[in-house]
Amino acid sequence: MISKAETKQFTQKSSYYWEGNPVLEKKVNQNFTGKYSLVDLCCGAGGLSKGLSDTKKIVPILGVDIFTEALKTYKLNNPMTSTILGDVRQIDDEMYKEAIGDTAVDIVAAGVPCQGFSLANLKRNVEDERNFLFLEVVRFIKLFNPKVVIIENVSGMRSLGNGEFEKAIAEALSGSGTKGYNVKRELLNAADFGVPQIRKRLIFVGVRKDIKEEFNFPNPKFDNIDMPYTTIQDALSDLPVLKNNEEKTVYASSPKSTYQKCMRNNVVNNKLYNHKSPNHPKTTIERIKNTVPGKPMYENYKQRIRLAWDIQSPTQLAGGIRPQFQFGHPDQSRGLSIRERARIQSFPDDFIFVGGTVQGRVQTGNAVPPLLAKNIGDSVLKVLGEKNE
């Protein structure tokens, strides 16, 4: 069993969280004529921004996060987007106005930190201060009155406070800004939209009340009957074999599935990033080797399985209880590389993660799957229509 000391270690604030004053890195807003502007609060590595921008009609103009390594990843993959590093509760109105300038904010999105809600969290409770960060989204709405608000969180929010917390968020969004919002909420499973992972997320979408079109959540596209779910084999089978603590930087084969072709669509010069295996002790290597694919590697941690080729991954986590590598590879005696974790989250291979193995796990585990975000974005665009400027 995990000890009290280990429990404390995995629930304390990470040293990678910025504790200084908020820092703005201002970029000249790119030309986005005919596209909608996006501000991504609590942006993390950028899964929401990536998926929404993949609609080709939405452009991120500002990303905000307290996690230093995640924001480095965000900036690397969004080089024309302004960023603020810091606690959203410490960012004053003037800094937001300086960051955004004269640009009208069309969409604000927030993957509000989930540790206070998540069923995986050892300290889950209604008093956790992180549960109230959504009020910072409300403050932002009052400043900029965006057309659409998107908030993402884990399914565990539904049961927090016997459902009262979920209701309170919807009511707070409904009355926000100068005109208020028509708010809908839905529990979506990323696997239903092509992500090779069972990842259920509670999504709130608010559309400003002066916009007459009604928002509807996207219908599932995969059902394992007419459109089979994406499997681990679909996602990972083209990536090079790795030994313990080995890195490979070029592909060894062509894509073997439609999903892999999508992941490699923008790869340049066959260059492969973030594909390094963890450095396991011999005991861990033997444990993975002796575990049947699809079964738990540890008796006390049923979600810590060795993946099988023909399934979807259970929900990826950012860290927490041991073993931190979380999943074993289906036919190699090791945990997953960051690239494999990114594939399971539907990040394409040209999306590069900054930081080492542990930070890569945190960033991929916290992220919104871009494929899920894109489907939400497509539904939002049905409401907004073409932007005329």
Tell what function each PLM region has:
Residues 2-5, 254-389:
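C-terminal target-recognition/interaction regions appended to catalytic cores
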Residues 11-41, 45-145, 155-159, 164-166:
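Core alpha/beta nucleotide-donor-binding catalytic domains of modification enzymes
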Residues 79, 112-113, 146, 196, ...:
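Proline-centered helix-kink/hinge sites
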Residues 27-28, 192, 301-305:
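Generic recognition of flexible, low-complexity loop/linker segments
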Residues 1-15:
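N-terminal intrinsically disordered, compositionally biased regulatory/targeting segments
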Residues 94-102, 115, 119-297:
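Class I S-adenosyl-L-methionine
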